[in-house]
Amino acid sequence: MNKQQLASKIWESANKMRSKIEANEYKDYILGFIFYKFLSDREEKYLAKEGWDEDYKAEFLHEEYKPEWEEMDYKQKDHLESISSIQRNLGYFIGYNNLFSTWLNKGSDFNVADVRDALSAFSRLINSSHKKVFDKIFDTLQTGLSKLGDGSNSQTHAISDLIHLIKDIPMDGKQDYDVLGFIYEYLISNFAANAGKKAGEFYTPHEVSLLMSEIVADHLKDRTEIKIYDPTSGSGSLLINIGRSVARYMGDSDRIKYYAQELKENTYNLTRMNLVMRGILPDNIVTRNGDTLEEDWPYFDESDPIGTYDPLYVDSVVSNPPYSQAWNPVDKETDPRYARFGVAPKGKADYAFLLHDLFHLKSDGIMTIVLPHGVLFRGGEEGEIRKNLIENNHIDAIIGLPANIFFGTGIPTIIMVLKQKRDRTDVLIVDASKGFEKVGKNNKLRASDIKRITDVVTKRLDIPKFSRVISRDEIRANDYNLNIPRYVDSSEKPESWDVYASMFGGIPEGEIDDLAAYWDAFPGLKEVLFEKRNRQYSTLKVADLKAAILGSSDVQNFINGYKASFEGFHEYLNTELMQVMTGVNISKEEAILSEEIFRRLLGIPLVDAYEAYQILDNDWNHIAVDLEIIQTEGFSATKQVDPNMIVKKKDGKDQEVQDGWVGHVVPFDLVQQTMLSDSLTAIQSIEDRLAEITSGYEEALDELPEEEKDKDFVNDDKTAFVWPEVKKAIKAKEVDVQVLAILKKVSSDNEEEKKLKKQLKDQSGALHIETKKTIETLSDEQVYSLLDQKWISPLIDGLGKLPESIISDFIAQIEK
């Protein structure tokens, strides 16, 4: 399975296994066990490098020293040195009996007590230099074990199911951090979708996080070392996305230091787990479990607060704090975070969080923060803070997000971008509320929405109905009210009906003028299509609108110009992807392809380059998965097939069983369409004939007189024939001639249907086996050809359809 399939399988099983436990709670247990497996596997990998085999681990990998070892010429100091070496290198020690693999090998002897003992031992054996990273990290899991069942037996059963569910997650290589991280993020997002209002406590939707990350990364792209900080870190995903985006420019991710603070202990533990599992060095992880507004961050060691006091200033702060949370503003006027700007009101801490973030920025730093849109226009203390932020030139951009984009709340939200020092005095305002797709109950930013917003913010673009750079004087004139509709009107033109046109015919000139972009692109077309009736109205003078438009030389020039712009693009993609599969930098390649598409579209009218980018992104997601497999498993993985596992009920329980095979990289259906087309065509012919027979049954039922449908040869709900009774009726010949003819026809078809179904089963089975053999014996050249058709052809086809879509939309606007 690829990482998406594995993540989906684990989620589906976990969601069933949690039973009555709240999603918000159950996530802490499964994610805790995944983290324990990660640490355990990591230790075993370290031991393997040190030459420890399984027998040696079983004998000597123990916390306690065994006296009998003296008789075997092993000294206690050697044993203690082994433990010390593991702790020094990893930051912790897990004994043999507490390894995740040992739990699995115990089988029916495994018990919940094994987990309790292991977690207790882990806390005891953390290296002192790694206390801040690992101390109490399993407390939430340890205290929650009792909630997994009413007694020891049921708890043991639940935990056993859990550890067997996650045992296949790979954790043994640098590339696999992405698999592990993907699954971890996938589970968090799905638990958030099922956690209602509590989701906001630990999760920022990936797309929002990615948008914030891209804006920050562009600002920091030329730096060689950075510090980033999230004062309300939740699961840590926002920090991780920032780090990943910045690392694309820096190259060395080990030069990024992560700071995080989180109030809730269980969520704080998620932050640390997530950071560690992404391969971030422990020395680059600095976290604190505390109240951000009450306990500001200057770093200090608890054993010597005064001597180790060090104010924290970072390159970037990112946060998604709780919206309009109550807080205690008493005696905060002299707090250096708020002294310059003012103190947020008691009932709404939004600006308290913002000012906290701003305080910790370096002079050349950048911050992004998610806030309820009320911060843009509410008065009182908040109005004064807003004024001071504007006058001190800190607000760089405001981005209005789509409604209902966060789990558990429909509150309208914004992202505010601020900088400690700016050369400009204006503010960019972006209304991105209209760009999204509906996914389940929530709205979700598409890849094209994220790129469009990022480009507008980083390039500070004015785009009608989307973005506008506002001068400070205009903001002053509006009394520092930053409500987005005051500056950017993204509303659609209201639909109107022209009474004169309705009564006397004709098309209002205003409606024709609304299509100005098309007339600019097709300068001679308007005269071909319309004839002026008077100054205010025109009439359509062509009988076939579509034919007239498609036959226009202007339109043909547009289509041909578009095609010419992508001349050689297939070959370009082949060079970029096919010829250097193992060397493609997966994290950077999509941006490279995107730049090429945007370059080719320069000067092409009407085409929205971001629509083209969305087509690329849709295809890239599949390409990236395949490239990951090829780069981690080798090119031979393209000639591999995997068991197709499905879930079936057996004795009332879901059981996973094999149902044929699937291509590991190359899909069965692609091989059948391109290399086994004769067999596939024969099967499709049988399927077509079976569909005809089924349709014939329905027609025959319709032809039967109503009184005949009450007879035994039709079922009770009059939707199908009863075949044994049909044969009896034919034999008895007690129906009229017309009905008898119908029965004979459907009976004959039924006999043919039985034979065809057997043929279909036999031929489908044979084709399936033949496809398996074909994939396993593919030549390298055949693999390249198939991957070209899987990766590149859909992208070329999708881009090729854009002009057709534009013309169709143009025709529809004239016709409406």
Regions found by a protein language model. Give the residues of each.
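Short, well-ordered loop/turn and helix-capping segments at boundaries between secondary-structure elements
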Residues: 41, 277, 323, 363, ...
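Active-site lining segments that contact anionic ligands and/or coordinate catalytic metals
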Residues: 313-314, 348-350, 364-366, 392-396, ...
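Conserved S-adenosyl-L-methionine
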Residues: 198-319, 324-328, 335-341, 345, ...
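Short secondary-structure boundary/capping segments
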Residues: 275, 332-335, 383-386, 413-415, ...
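Conserved Class I SAM-dependent methyltransferase catalytic core
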Residues: 16, 22-38, 345-418
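Conserved, well-folded catalytic cores of nucleic-acid-processing
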Residues: 16, 165, 169, 186, ...
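Non-catalytic, mostly N-terminal accessory regions of nucleic-acid modification and defense proteins
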Residues: 1-216, 283-286, 400-403, 427, ...
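Conserved P-loop NTPase
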Residues: 415-455
